[in-house]
Curated annotation (Swiss-Prot):
Catalyzes the methylthiolation of an aspartic acid residue of ribosomal protein uS12. It is found in: Cytoplasm. This is Ribosomal protein uS12 methylthiotransferase RimO. GO terms for molecular function: 4 iron, 4 sulfur cluster binding; aspartic acid methylthiotransferase activity; metal ion binding; protein methylthiotransferase activity. The keyword Transferase applies.
Amino acid sequence: MNETIAPARLPRIGMVSLGCPKALTDSELILTQLSAEGYQTSKTFEGADLVIVNTCGFIDDAVKESLDTIGEALAENGKVIVTGCLGARAGEGGGNLVREMHPSVLAVTGPHATQEVMDAVHQNLPKPHDPFIDLVPGGFGVAGVKLTPRHYAYLKISEGCNHRCTFCIIPSMRGDLVSRPVGDVLSEAKALFEGGVKELLVISQDTSAYGVDVKYRTGFWDGKPVKTRMLELVQTLGEIAEPYGAWVRLHYVYPYPSVDEVIPFMATGKILPYLDVPFQHSHPDVLRRMKRPASGERNLERIQRWREACPELVIRSTFIAGFPGETEEEFQHLLDFLREAQIDRAGCFAYSDVDGAVANELPGMLPMEVREERRARFMAVAEEVSIERLRRRVGATMQVLVDHAPALGRKGGRGRSYADAPEIDGVVHLLPPEKISKQLKVGEFTRAQIVGVQGHDLVARPI
């Protein structure tokens, strides 16, 4: 008599990804490899055989969130592997911070450590044996599992940073710059577009420095030589994206002179005229205390030239208020810069004395209430500038990528224009279409006429 043998239950792994988009891409690599090896995923801690927590360790709030999440996973599951930036931080006792706070975790790794995480998984939850799954090649460097909606994805081009800004501890956690081979980056981009991605967000710790570590050596893609450098990379990305009608958006672009070469290419429409530039401050003395890698003395002039070359350019930036030693005059310089530069989207942090940051030892540490007060004043000016620039768009017709459209958009929806990166910028609220035949589909583009401004967002009618 033949007996049917029930298939063995495949091991399940829970995954929590905290922090920035760069950490998200690390999580995607881990999940891709887990999937290739036959592991299944669990949406709950209780339903998993093991939980992986990818942490953030940059600012105090992020550290607390990461430690709390690890604690929750331990309480609800008991078997936890920790990876990410917090895994590389030392505690007050000199040992590993995570192990000091949660000694029962199974393993701790730093960021960008897919193989170390997989080794820890194998040690604590042996991979399922499947003669078919075992033939599947690894998913490193290709468009594997994605944690973003299907129509947009992050493309990480490098890991680490060569700079030693006094307020930052990222190099101590993620190491020096390591650029991905240009052929691998372009192959992943092509695969993402073929898979339906309509917006590619290029990320790294320092996008402008892409290729510095390999002396801009020439790589190959599609049988053609391509230099490992930001300009050649984005030019080729634009060419790959064009047949798909897809967007390419640049993030974390330090204001080096090389950026000037990219702006005219943005003006052609091959990549989005959108630049995420972390200026951090405007006053030369503050920038010197920060040890910023690019001189800021001529940033205002450069921005004016950028806008002349590409009038549609949108600039997003982040700043720090209340840096040690910052005078009221230096802070006013920053507010004046914000107004004159007409920064479209600006975020601001009150200086936080992160453990291990060199800036903590600088003279002139300001009281927290002063730092927070300056941050609030900064954001008030930033809001004025942003809303005024949004108002200029009323009456214009823009292409909008639809992110949300219940009932095919008959009651309206939500999307983003080229000026809006997901999660960090505003959105475009789409009114119900006037034409009955007009439908809105998530992940598709629609033309819309801007009819109003609502806070940091636009209101538009699909046409």
